[in-house]
Amino acid sequence: MSQKGHTRSTFSGKLGFVLSAAGASVGLGNIWRFPYLAAKYGGGIFLLVYILLAMTFGYTMIVAETSLGRMTGKNPVGAFKAFGNSGWLRFGGWINAIIPILIVPYYSVIGGWVVKYLADYALGRSSALAADGYFSAFISNGVPAEVCFVVFAALTLTIIFAGVENGIERVSKFMMPVLVVLSVIIAVYSVTRPGALEGVKYFLVPNLAHFSWMTVVAAMGQMFYSLSIAMGILITFGSYMKKDISIEGSTRNVEVFDTAIAIMAGLMIIPAVFAFSGGDPDALKAGPSLMFVTIPKVFDSMGLGTPIGILFFLLVLFAALTSSIALTESAVSTFQDELGWGRKKSTAIVGVVMLVLGSLSSLGYGPLAGVRILGMQLLDFFDFLTNSIMMPIAAITVCLLVSRVAGVGRIEQEILLSEPRFRRKRVFNAMIRFLCPFFAAIILISSVANAFGWISM
């Protein structure tokens, strides 16, 4: 369909793009998964592997997706169609476009849980939050969890309604600096607790005894999901990027921002849990149990548990919101471009999809708890489908598009529009042709194996 009357929005400049892209990258995975994996797989060794992968694999995928978006000025579907109309190109475009549509509903459910905990801390209920069974009782009680989900979704959609520059960019410019300040405050408080130093050492000092090939696989998977690769976000944001903004420079900024926040998350959580548990690394869990069960118990044991709890869940809310905004914008962009709809109509339709699929995920722990797919509750199934299967496949299609159809030369031409030379061209060329597809295949296999319990990550 034509896009009559639809003028492409843009970010105002490099800062707007970088903070928005960094906001997309900095999400719940940085806070509830990175510290756990770093502690489990050798601390400093895991960090080193993660940084090396971010500078190679992550860098290549960010540059590729951003360049495709800016080059074509399209959403993922349009970006792929710009190079042909073959079946696999249509498949590649649509899988990259559908992923955020499926992720943002259940992500908003978790965002609703964050809203609930922030409100409870603000009301001085830290002891209740730390009680055994509080979290499971909350998510299994359909109405409160559903209301919190709707509140979070409404916040996201309100920002999307405002547009790229006045909504996404403006909110990111406010939230991201505040998020950094909050992470520093909480990390300083955490590492100065009695007994916390052992946690700092456990997190930062390399432990070769814990190093194995799984360290590389785990770091690869975390980096892949953390940088918002293969979600259609970077292609969409790239299409909003002005031609005079450096793609390589912006990518470096996003890499640094995301890695710094992940490290700060480790310093916030691991020392605090160590201080609380008496140095027991088994107290560190990944996912909701860390954030909504362990952390409240840790905060309740601290002298300033309530104010730290407020700051922490405000930080988490900002991280969740910036990611949900990016996911929703990618979905809205697809409806705008492919159906020729305006922003308001596209946002409203995405909102309906969020409400329907999100309600299924939310109620899947309560009234719909008996409904399971492949033995998984509904939220877990949507997470498995998108993260473990669709995203690695989407990444492979991007690699094939760049290396086999568009050509690295086209990417270089796009990059040279805003900078004198393609500094990491050799790295990009080798990664996009050979290593990135291979790494994505490893992530696909290991993620599926982990989901079915064949390996433990």
Which residues are covered by each model-predicted region?
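A generic transmembrane alpha-helix motif of multi-pass inner-membrane proteins
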Residues: 379-400, 423-457
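Extracellular loop-to-transmembrane helix junctions
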Residues: 38-64, 144, 390-394
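Inter-helical loop and helix-membrane interface segments of multi-pass membrane transporters/permeases
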Residues: 5-8, 37-41, 76-95, 108-165, ...
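Membrane-interface "cap" regions at the ends of multi-pass membrane proteins
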Residues: 1-32, 61-66, 70-83, 87-91, ...
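Helix-loop-helix connectors at the membrane interface of multi-pass transporters/channels
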Residues: 2-4, 78, 111-140, 241-244, ...
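Transmembrane helix-boundary motif of multi-pass solute transporters/channels
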Residues: 13-53, 235-238, 249-252, 256-259, ...
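Membrane-embedded translocation segments of transport machinery
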Residues: 2-7, 11, 169, 173-321, ...
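Select transmembrane alpha-helical segments in multipass membrane proteins
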Residues: 10-21, 45-49, 87-101, 147-152, ...
